[in-house]
Amino acid sequence: MAMVSEFLKQAWFMDNQEQECIKSSKGGSSVQSRPNFDPSADVSALDKAITVKGVDEATIIDILTKRTNAQRQQIKAAYQQAKGKSLEEDLKKVLKSHLEDVVVALLKTPAQFDAEELRASMKGLGTDRR
């Protein structure tokens, strides 16, 4: 997604007179690294949220949306090591619909997400010659 977003920004800037104004504005990620980040504590909280009766979606959302992508990757690895199974697969089993899609997307690296979105967007493109 980041690559596509950057491409669209560059394409838009070609004919835009406000380019300098926009370039000077502060940007970047709104999610900051947590100084006291502990992946094993997050793994425990996520495991509890997944296994509790009724699934604690609020805890899952709270943890995954308040961590940087690098921290989410550490959580994934720590979960795999501690539980011997994939965090993504466990979340897919208990979550449904759009929430499942968003949570699974949050667990991907930016490159994985971009590649899968580009592949999905091009699926079915081409001609059907007869």
UniProtKB/Swiss-Prot annotation:
One Pfam family, short name: Annexin
Swiss-Prot/TrEMBL keywords: Adaptive immunity, Annexin, Calcium, Calcium/phospholipid-binding, Cell membrane, Cell projection, Cilium, Cytoplasm, Cytoplasmic vesicle, Endosome, Immunity, Inflammatory response, Innate immunity, Isopeptide bond, Membrane, Metal-binding, Nucleus, Phospholipase A2 inhibitor, Phosphoprotein, Repeat, Secreted
Crosslink site: Isoglutamyl lysine isopeptide (Gln-Lys) (interchain with K-?): Q19
Source organism superkingdom: Eukaryota
Entry membrane topology: Peripheral membrane protein
Record GO biological process: actin cytoskeleton organization; adaptive immune response; cellular response to glucocorticoid stimulus; G protein-coupled receptor signaling pathway, coupled to cyclic nucleotide second messenger; granulocyte chemotaxis; inflammatory response; innate immune response; monocyte chemotaxis
Binding residue positions for Ca(2+) 2: K92, L95, E100
UniProt xrefs under PROSITE patterns: ANNEXIN_1, ANNEXIN_2
Residues that, per the record, bind Ca(2+) 4: T127
Chain positions recorded as Ca(2+) 1 binding sites: G54, V55, E57
Chief place where the protein resides: nucleus
InterPro entries membership: Annexin, Annexin_repeat, Annexin_repeat_CS, Annexin_sf, ANX1
Sites bearing Phosphoserine, chain numbering: S24
Annotated positions binding Ca(2+) 3: M122, G124, G126
Binding site for Ca(2+) 5: R130
Family per record: Belongs to the annexin family.
Other observations noted: Was originally identified as calcium and phospholipid binding protein that displays Ca(2+)-dependent binding to phospholipid membranes and can promote membrane aggregation in vitro. Was initially identified as inhibitor of phospholipase A2 activity (in vitro). Inhibition of phospholipase activity is mediated via its phospholipid binding activity that limits the access of phospholipase to its substrates.
Record protein name field: Annexin A1
Organism of origin: Gallus gallus (Chicken)
